[in-house]
């Protein structure tokens, strides 16, 4: 960190820049005299737009370049959408702050139809997510699900051009970009379980940078951090990346942590679901035990097919 200047590594998409600006404003409000600068950059996931994410392969498609900037001291922190953050970090880096979660649900977006159930047989639905795909296919096997890549504006443009009858996007992203009016239905977790960490913004930095960590401390939201910890522990045990058919959602209700999760075959033909309840301080163990239950109930074979290789140990 240079004098009183803190540099944020961020992707260049409108949503990523919103998240970085949000963190910048929060930091400057908490620390008088601190100047925060954005360092926009392009990631591999931003460049490869003609291939479904699940086929691009690899973890950290949207974060690796930002992490290199941290390691090379070209930036002090990196701001991420938590659903894009791998469960493992390069040596010397770590996730130190998780901001308060926005609405984690998925949004049904259509210009012609009011809900998923209103779609006629054979309707074309766009999504880049195997998690969304498997849940849609299970509920509506009569739909045609096609890949949809690009930033939020690009995806909405393809819907408006008639390429799709409906698309599925994150409620949080639409709200942050002032596009809440495009949401026809916010899909409850019972209908479409969110991605791990969906709706939360995470901040990564060098673990030995005590000054920066102290500056970030006021931005951490304890309840969100506990919920996301449970979801990510489950995902780590499953060895899941952000492009696999895994959904997970934790809630804190009356002091009890309730974790739900699923693993599904992309075509919706198989779905393994489970849930656990426990104490907030046991978030990590709750996630691990639920993952083990899923693996033993059929998730191991589903994930092996998805990875076309070895199932999780």
Curated annotation (Swiss-Prot):
Belongs to the HMBS family. Its cofactor is dipyrromethane. Tetrapolymerization of the monopyrrole PBG into the hydroxymethylbilane pre-uroporphyrinogen in several discrete steps. One of its GO terms (molecular function) is hydroxymethylbilane synthase activity. SUPFAM superfamilies: Periplasmic binding protein-like II, Porphobilinogen deaminase (hydroxymethylbilane synthase), C-terminal domain. Pathway: Porphyrin-containing compound metabolism; protoporphyrin-IX biosynthesis; coproporphyrinogen-III from 5-aminolevulinate: step 2/4. This is Porphobilinogen deaminase. The lineage of its organism: Bacteria, Pseudomonadati, Pseudomonadota, Gammaproteobacteria, Enterobacterales. Pfam families: Porphobil_deam (PF01379), Porphobil_deamC (PF03900). One of its GO terms (biological process) is protoporphyrinogen IX biosynthetic process. Monomer. Binds 1 dipyrromethane group covalently. It catalyses: 4 porphobilinogen + H2O = hydroxymethylbilane + 4 NH4(+). InterPro entries: HemC (IPR000860), Porphobilin_deaminase_cofac_BS (IPR022419), Porphobilin_deaminase_N (IPR022417), Porphobilinogen_deaminase_C (IPR022418), Porphobilinogen_deaminase_C_sf (IPR036803). Its EC number is 2.5.1.61. The keyword Transferase applies. It is an enzyme of class 2 (transferase). The modification S-(dipyrrolylmethanemethyl)cysteine is found at residue 242. One of its GO terms (cellular component) is cytoplasm. The porphobilinogen subunits are added to the dipyrromethane group. NCBIfam families: hemC. Keywords: Porphyrin biosynthesis, Transferase.
